[in-house]
């Protein structure tokens, strides 16, 4: 399974890239706004660090304007993927862009019906939001299972990007289901490292090594 980082912060991206565990990056207008830098400049900077898919979201709501904005973003770097919200205009724009071989990540997906429409329109990626579904007492991971099954049934070429990931168990569950990709905030990625038995083991090894050195002086 691929892991994308859900951020527009360069330091977070550089750190995760140095760990060798990320395959791409997803951004959205909210994440970019936190950085107080020009949008296109930041997307270009991210592409220079990560040689994998980098999702950049359009802000237009009309399909014509979405296409115009998407084409400008696609010119930034060959790795840019256009992020488009799941709307009727978004579907129309996705159809046009996919026919021109511009990769689309259809976002804000909350049902298997929406995912099916996105894939029919030609989306390269579909991004179901598991955490937000869990927030309203729905089952986010059940949605992932359904989309995986639809892709298997009809051999769609789209990949699932599990989004709105809140904790490591979301990631593990997605991997067990067979999702292609998870996109995670930096703090969630960091929490994947943690296990109390690992810390206890390191402390014990270091204590034993120090005792050994003291005995053999």
Swiss-Prot record:
It is an enzyme of class 2 (transferase). PROSITE patterns: TRANSALDOLASE_1 (PS01054), TRANSALDOLASE_2 (PS00958). InterPro entries: Aldolase_TIM, TAL/FSA, Transaldolase_3B, Transaldolase_3B/F6P_aldolase, Transaldolase_AS, TSA/FSA_arc/bac. Keywords: Cytoplasm, Pentose shunt, Schiff base, Transferase. It holds the Pfam family TAL_FSA. HAMAP family: Transaldolase_3b. This is Probable transaldolase. It comes from Pseudothermotoga lettingae (strain ATCC BAA-301 / DSM 14385 / NBRC 107922 / TMO). The gene is tal.
């Amino acid at each position: 399974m691929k892991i994308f980082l859900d951020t527009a912060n360069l330091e977070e991206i550089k750190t995760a890239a140095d760990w060798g565990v990320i395959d791409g990056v997803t951004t959205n207008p909210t994440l970019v706004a936190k950085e107080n830098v020009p949008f296109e400049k930041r997307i270009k900077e991210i592409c220079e660090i990560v040689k994998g898919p980098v999702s950049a979201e359009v802000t237009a709501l009309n399909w014509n304007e979405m296409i115009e904005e998407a084409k400008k973003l696609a010119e930034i770097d060959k790795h840019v993927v256009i992020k488009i919200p799941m709307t009727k205009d978004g579907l129309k724009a996705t159809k046009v862009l996919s026919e021109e071989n511009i990769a689309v990540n259809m976002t804000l997906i909350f049902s298997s019906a929406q995912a099916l429409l996105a894939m029919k329109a030609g989306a390269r990626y579909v991004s179901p939001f598991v955490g937000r579904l869990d927030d309203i007492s729905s089952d986010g991971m059940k949605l992932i299972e359904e989309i995986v099954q639809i892709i298997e049934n009809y051999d769609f070429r789209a990949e699932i990007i599990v989004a709105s990931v809140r904790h490591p168990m979301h990631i593990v569950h997605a991997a067990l289901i067979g999702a292609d990709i998870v996109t995670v905030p930096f703090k969630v990625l960091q929490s994947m490292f943690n296990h109390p038995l690992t810390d206890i083991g390191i402390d014990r090894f270091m204590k034993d090594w120090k005792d050994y050195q003291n005995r053999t002086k």
